[in-house]
Amino acid sequence: MPRNKDLSAYTALVTGASSGIGLEYARQLAAQGANLVMVSIDREDLDREAKKIVDTSGVSVETICMDLAQPDAANKLYDHCRQKGIQIEILINNAGIFSFQEITHTDPKKIETSNLKLTTATAYKIRNLCCCNMLWNRGGSFTTFTVTT
C-alpha cells in the first residue's frame, strides 16, 4: 500500500477487520484518510477497534458483523453496502478461520465446509461483486488473502 497517499475520496471494505492483518490494513487505510467498511464475525472486537480508528483518524467507519462462511454472505454484504449508498473503491479480502484445536480434534467436514466457503467461494464472490462496480466506475483495487491455521 502506498504510504502517505491521500485516500480521503475512497472507501475501503476490509473483511476480517477486527484483528490481525485485516485490522492493520484498516488502520493504515484510515491513517491515509480512507473511509472504512469493517467486517468481522466478532461484534465486540469489531466495535471496539472501529471506535479506536474513528477516534484517531476521524474517518467514517461502517461496521458489519457477519459470518462470511454462510451461504449468500457475499451478496448480503454487497447489498448492505449498496442500500447504505456505500461505494467500494478498495477491497481487502482478508477473512479467515483460525482453529485453536489440535488438527486431530477438529472435524474435517467442518473445516472443509466453513473454511473453503470463506476463503474461496465467499472471497471470490465479494471480489467479483466489488470489481464489477470498480470497472463500472473506472477505478479501484483489491487484495485477497486466504489464510488457514
Regions found by a protein language model. Name each.
Residues 32-48:
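Conserved glycine-rich Rossmann-like NAD(P)H-binding loop of the short-chain dehydrogenase/reductase
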Residues 1-12:
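Flexible N-terminal pre-Rossmann segment of NAD(P)-dependent oxidoreductases
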Residues 15, 88-96, 144:
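Rossmann-fold scaffold of SDR-type NAD(P)-dependent oxidoreductases
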Residues 19, 96-99:
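Flexible cofactor-recognition loop at the NAD(P)H-binding site
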Residues 43-44, 65-76, 108:
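The beta1-alpha1 cofactor-binding region of Rossmann-like NAD(H)/NADP(H)-dependent oxidoreductases
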